[in-house]
Amino acid sequence: MEKIVSLCKRRGFIYQSSEIYGGINGFWDYGPLGAELKRNIKELWWNTMTRQRDDVVGLEATIIMSPQIWKASGHVDTFSDPMCDCRLTNKRFRADQVEPQDGIVYYFKGAFNMVSEEFGFIEGEKEEVEKYLKQKREIDDLKKLAEELSVSPDQRKQKIGAAILEFTNLKKEIKEPFSVLLPPGKPPEAAFVVAGQFYEKRGMECPWPIKSHTEKVTGDTRHNPENGAELTEARPFNLMFKTYVGPVESEDNVAYLRPETAQAIFAQFKNVLETSRQKVPFGIAQVGKAFRNEVTPRNYTFRSREFEQMELEFFIKPDEVVEAIKGHVTPGAELDTRHSTLDTSSWGWEAWHKYWVEERIRFYESIGLPRNTLVEYWQKPEELAHYARATVDILYKFPFSKRDEKGELTGEELEGIAARSDFDLSQHARFSGKPMGVFDEELRAAWGKLDEARKAGLSKRYYEARLKYLTKMGVEAVKAEQEAREDAAGLAKGQYIPHVIEPSAGVDRLILALICSAYSEVAETDDKGKTETRVILKFHPRVAPIKAAVLPLLKNKPELVKKAQEVRDQLRPWMNVFYDDGGSIGRRYARQDEAGTPFCVTIDFDTLGEKPELKDTVTVRYRDDGKQERLGIGELANWLLPKIR
């Protein structure tokens, strides 16, 4: 990762925010190449998810919204991470991300001040006392030593023994428990050093920790992996950035920077449905900034406090509605999503969930992430959010990912695809008092044709699902049963609350994954036998920041420069082009390889007609293998466009 981080700064992909003032942790700026890469990714996602589909429309919502939205979504009360602090350094940790450790825990019950003015030392005695104190850490051993010294025929040793006895009985002490974990192989003295630093910070001039006992532990997460010091008890830390709307900072004016883009989509669901002339199933997509006050931002841009999301909320019919209309629900296991034309009319939530998982993996492959670098991880039941029926995380094998028992990278999350049931729309209906259900004429007509047994069975299933949700949300039992019955009765009228499938991806994580995947090194030996390592970023042309570089062979030949500028201007309306005339042609190729530019277009003397048959042609060099071919200037744009789109 160090090489990638260095390259990103050196070539203008990513800078630390506010770097001239020391930086600010968890915030990053995108330089010229990074900004282009980011724009390309967002546009490709938007085109794939909205413009190339008839069933998805877009939304762009504000970053600050009514705080009631975050109350309804649960973010105000539950959007938190467990946080703990190192009791020695005050460094903060995510309690659930502390690395497990094995070793021996040393428990201390407090500390004495090792040197006291009450001793009344004679000259040279203080140093002798300190020498003995440092040798014997256990208080009982120290008392035993003092007793031995006090009966020594050497009067000086008698005085030292008396001074130590006086020390052990002093009242200048701290009775504050503390513990230190030592990994295997570390000497016990190291625990006393760390404990001494802890008690020194609590006002003791020269603390002498008092050990109570030790304990052998495995998989311990109660101590700082960096220094072994004890961590505080975990406590919830809300991740939302709080601010105020208007000139008065009062609780009435509290607002939050949005921690996700999804909730605005749910809040605007009815408006979009009514104005876009869509029908369920359909989706609403949004790309935008989100903010989370992470306890410990880590792994470069992977976990940041300001980031960008690409989210789709795809609204579908509940299974009971699908079954009422079509007579059955297509099992997800039987679904083959590779066909371009699919009959989705009988799809339930499992089929739609599987479809979106496979669609998203195909997207990642289409922009240059090999399938063998991706992991499809199905969350276990105990890992699911309370509202989710199923969630699949698409993981990428970053260099910093953990390794399994076989030594294989396990991957870190790029995107989650969650089947969120009807939780979100139901919550906003409850908190806003506004209906979030839809009317479906097809359902109303189909319901009237069902026999009574079928109606009763479907109504019962819908009632039980709604009752489960209402009970989980703390609605009083009698009221919950009444509301659930009313919801079930709504099926006969063609009314229901849509369910949601949510593919949610992080732009910044995807950028980092693409850079990691594209990074490669090539060792080249020159004519003098000197070997040099070059970096090539093998971006897929679709995402590459610069699509083509236009290079005149020589800078000091005006006719070459003029023709190169004409070629540049011809390509600019169609793609991002970079013009470079500085340095040897080999060095310019190397610079473009490092920037990830897939094509270099060289204007040479043959372009000008030195060889008449090659006039108005250029050399096009491909980044990954260095191969070149000759093309006419007039056909250049048409040759490049299919390769970069």
Segments the model singles out, each with a brief description of its role:
Residues 1-645:
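NTP/phosphate- and nucleic-acid-binding module
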